[in-house]
Each structure stands twice: as structure tokens, then as C-alpha cells.
Amino acid sequence: MERHIDINQFDYDLPDERIAKFPLAERSASKLLVYRNGAISESRFDRLGEELPEGAMLVFNNTKVIRARIIMHKPSGARIEVFCLEPHAPADYERAFAVKGKCAWSCIVGNLKKWKEGALVIDFTLDGTPQQLRAYRTGTGGREQIVRFEWEADLTFGELLELLGRIPIPPYLNRDSQQIDYTRYQTVYSKFEGSVAAPTAGLHFTPELIASLGAAGVEFEEVTLHVGAGTFLPVKDDDACRHAMHTEHFEIRRTTVERLLHRWGHIVAVGTTSVRTLESLAALAWRIRREGSPDEMRAVGQWELYDIPASYTGREALEELLAYMERNDLGTLKASKQIMIEPLGYRWRI
């Protein structure tokens, strides 16, 4: 089926002075927009419990934003920013952050024209000893560069990023990252490193709000989706359907699939990253039905969700996925997706 979305329908004026450059002192004091029965009203986030349906189970994305921006220099002095997007070798996120000595990442490189060859360096001191991180271009991966990092310090790559990297805040804030961003541009429930942008809907939760919701009977579950830099990419084509969606990696535990089935009809996804993860499960399950395997190494395609028959329900999809994980003794399913959910014509599954 041919699809067309006129991107001009989504144009609107957003004056710079209307963009909050810094968070409120209290996360949950932010405004909450409520849509109910065709009417829009305004509330506060700390009153979220008043708006949730009885028996709700919130699904959080527990990804953690990494200090992905590294400012490096050529021996000539040229300043070049290396923005780490996703691990290349090793490709597994957990291993990529735990590795020592060398690794390779898919990166966006600022001022790339100044980096034709040779190493970029950043000098630092560890326990009084001079150290150095070096970066080499080793190839391209579409719009990104494959960059190999090497170092002698007894640090993991994750520890190096914590020491030398900067937090990547949204470009529309039009400011440099500051100390406050290292704590406030993270959700309070973030656990697993890998994102270059925060799952922003979750930024307004506080431990106190989560505790009060739990006391009121709200349940919680978590998925992990590492948000990619493509979330900031503008749609440049007049037809949004011709915009190539970026790849994002996600994982879900078998116990989570079990609880989704147990709480079917009461699932409330927190933010679009949780939505994208949950909806992608239907495509993986449909692959199992058709091919006998979810083929996790193949990203869920941009329009793959639309190829699933209307008769195939979300509950069936979760049951199919759970049975596959049980047969193969999988505690966690890891996959990736490039899906686009358009405003008209999409049938929600989960």
C-alpha cells in the first residue's frame, strides 16, 4: 500500500522563549496535559495518579543516557567532536562498556573535514599518571563513521566515557551541557547504559511519586530501549514516509512478557520509547508464526508492523513470544527496530 504523510501538516510556531532551557527544581511539579473524551485539560505531573485507570501497570524504559560526546584534538590543534552512537566491536552494549584497551563505535563526527587521517587524542591524568585516549577512523557505516578507540589506562570504556565524555542534551535547547544535566537528564529509574537521548516522558517521575503510585495499587514493569541520535534528526522530505527511520536496540525480559499478559488491558506505556518497544514485539512474534524464529539480528522494518494481519491480536503476539522464549530457555530477548507509527491507519497491538 502506498503511504503519504504531508510533513507540512505538522508545522507549528515554537518561539525559543517558550522552550524550557532548564528543568524545574522539582521533577514532578511539571505540567501534565490530559486528553479525555475529546477534551484537553491541564494538570500537574504529581497528580498523575488521579488520571490513571484503575489497575494500571506502568511500563518504564530503564535505559541510561551515556556521556556520548567526546571533545578530541588533532596534533595540529583542530578541535573535533566524536559523538558515540552505538557499539560496533564488540556490538553488545554490556560488553562494549566493560571492555578495556580498545573498542570500535559507530559515531557522528563533528568537523569531519578536518580529520582526513591519523589519530585524534585527548590527554588526561589518572591517579597522577598522564594517560591518553586515541581515536582512529576505520570506515563508514551509512551516515556514520566507524571509530576505533585505544587506551592504556586500566579503565573500561564506560569508565572512560564517565571521565571524559559530555552528556548529549537536545539540540533545540541551544545551550551547552552543564553539571545539572548529568543528574537531571536521566530518569530516576535508569539502569542500563546505552542511550544518547533520555526517554523524556519519564524525566518527571520522582522516587516519592513512584512510591505513592505503588501504594495506590499501580504496578510497574520495565523494558530497555537505547534511544539513538536519529531521534533528533529532522524530516527533510515533504513526504514523511520517505524519511528513513534510524535503528534502535531494545531488550525485554521473559518475566516482563509474562506480566504484560497477566496485566493485559491495563498496560500504560511511559513515553514513546516504551511504546516503540512494546509495539515491535508484535512484529517479532509474527515472524515466529511465519518463520519459526523472530530473527533478532534483523531490525523490525519501518513498515513491518503494517504487514501483520488485523486478525492477529496483541495478546496472541505476547503468547507466541513467551512460548518461543520458554522453548529456547531465553531469559531476555534482544532485538532492534526502525518502526514508524503514522497518525492514521495504525492499529495498536499491545
What are these regions (language model features)?
Residues 1-350:
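Surface-exposed, charge/polar-rich loops and edge strands
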